[in-house]
UniProtKB/Swiss-Prot annotation:
Pfam families: DNA_gyraseB
Record-linked PANTHER family: DNA GYRASE SUBUNIT B, MITOCHONDRIAL, DNA GYRASE/TOPOISOMERASE SUBUNIT B
GO cellular component: cytoplasm
Class in the EC hierarchy, top level: isomerase
Keywords: ATP-binding, Cytoplasm, DNA-binding, Isomerase, Nucleotide-binding, Topoisomerase
Gene Ontology BP terms: DNA topological change
Protein's name according to its UniProt entry: DNA gyrase subunit B
Described function: A type II topoisomerase that negatively supercoils closed circular double-stranded (ds) DNA in an ATP-dependent manner to modulate DNA topology and maintain chromosomes in an underwound state. Negative supercoiling favors strand separation, and DNA replication, transcription, recombination and repair, all of which involve strand separation. Also able to catalyze the interconversion of other topological isomers of dsDNA rings, including catenanes and knotted rings. Type II topoisomerases break and join 2 DNA strands simultaneously in an ATP-dependent manner.
Any one GO MF annotation of this record: DNA topoisomerase type II (double strand cut, ATP-hydrolyzing) activity
UniProt KW Cytoplasm keyword: yes
Organism per entry: Rhodobacter capsulatus (Rhodopseudomonas capsulata)
Compartment annotation: Cytoplasm
Phosphoprotein found in the keyword field: no
EC number assigned by the record: 5.6.2.2
Length: 134
């Protein structure tokens, strides 16, 4: 519901958000996302309910997994070859609104303000969950 609220003034391009939740090696991962008709990407990353305005390893893992999954689908389905296009991460995230939340037992941040998550074990946890669920 939060992603719908964030996009209340935009036109959605899908009926319902995609929701993924799971735990990978003791790290809880929750993702809610959908696309709208804008060109702007909005991703709100959280660690243990604390927002990270500068992202971090959880955001890097999400972006990497999303790009790989969409690119693989485009190649496997023949869309990329038929339309003669190469997808990039920017293409995959255009119009995306996402709330990404991780629960980490002992998170590491780049500073005391907790603006950026730097715990290296979080990236593969997020990548694995997003790859599996998408």
């Amino acid at each position: 519901e939060f992603v719908k609220y964030l996009d209340r003034s935009k036109t959605a391009v899908m009926p319902d958000p995609i929701y993924m939740v799971g735990e990978v090696r003791g790290i809880g991962v929750e993702v809610a996302m959908w696309w709208n008709d804008s060109y702007h990407e909005t991703v709100l990353p959280f660690t243990n309910n604390i927002p990270q305005r500068d992202g971090g390893t959880h955001l890097a893992g999400f972006r990497g997994a999303l790009t790989r999954t969409i690119t693989k689908y485009a190649q496997d389905s023949g869309i990329a070859k038929r339309e003669k296009i190469d997808f990039t991460g920017d293409d995959a995230r255009e119009g995306l609104t996402c709330v990404l939340s991780v629960k980490v037992p002992d998170p590491k941040f780049s500073s005391q303000t907790k603006d950026k998550l730097v715990s290296s074990e979080v990236r593969p946890a997020v990548e694995n969950l997003v790859n599996e669920k998408l």
